[in-house]
Regions:
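Conserved alpha/beta cores of soluble small-molecule-handling proteins
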Residues: 1-174
Length: 174
């Protein structure tokens, strides 16, 4: 594992913890059903881009999914800035981060197996932008196709909601 990756921290359900220590229970509804949403922004020269607007969009997704995370948008902005601040020293000059918030409905207990309802899972992370890995697309171009299977129609699920269901994009990469 990259030494810097080993040092990154994330916000996880109320605490700033080592990123490597974040664990999602297998009964988390996002893992089971894709029942969650996210938003991402990035930094430019270390400065986060339109964080408030991205968090507002996150809260629109949360409202659509009827998930209450018991945090205000301003608190999520503050948490996001804290995560970025604690990870900024790990970047080389000229490098930047993705800064993202990932929310799920959390664990929903079923039956008597000993699991408790957890409430929402809230994670805020920084991930290095990997321009070097994508540079060849800009230099050489890439082939594209129009798939025969389309995304979920907007009558079924609002395309304005950034949900955890990106399986169609995963399939396109295979």
């Amino acid at each position: 594992m990259n030494q810097r990756a080993n040092q990154r921290v994330a916000y996880y359900n109320g605490n700033i913890v080592a990123e490597r220590d974040v664990r999602i229970p297998f009964r988390d509804r996002s893992f089971l059903y894709g029942d969650g949403c996210f938003d991402m922004t990035r930094t430019f020269n270390g400065t986060v881009f339109k964080l408030t607007e991205h968090v507002e969009r996150l809260f629109e997704s949360l409202a659509y999914l009827r998930i209450d995370i018991n945090l205000s948008p301003s608190e999520v902005v503050e948490i996001s800035n804290e995560v970025l601040s604690r990870n900024r020293h790990l970047l080389d000059a000229g490098d930047d981060y993705w800064l993202g918030q990932r929310i799920s409905r959390g664990v929903k207990a079923v039956g008597d197996e000993g699991w408790d309802d957890t409430g929402p899972t809230v994670i805020v992370v920084c991930e290095p932008l990997t321009f070097q890995e994508r540079a060849h697309y800009y230099r050489d171009g890439l082939k594209v196709i129009i798939p025969s299977v389309r995304r979920t129609p907007p009558e079924m699920l609002s395309p304005r909601t950034k949900t955890h269901n990106y399986l169609n994009l995963v399939m396109a990469d295979l």
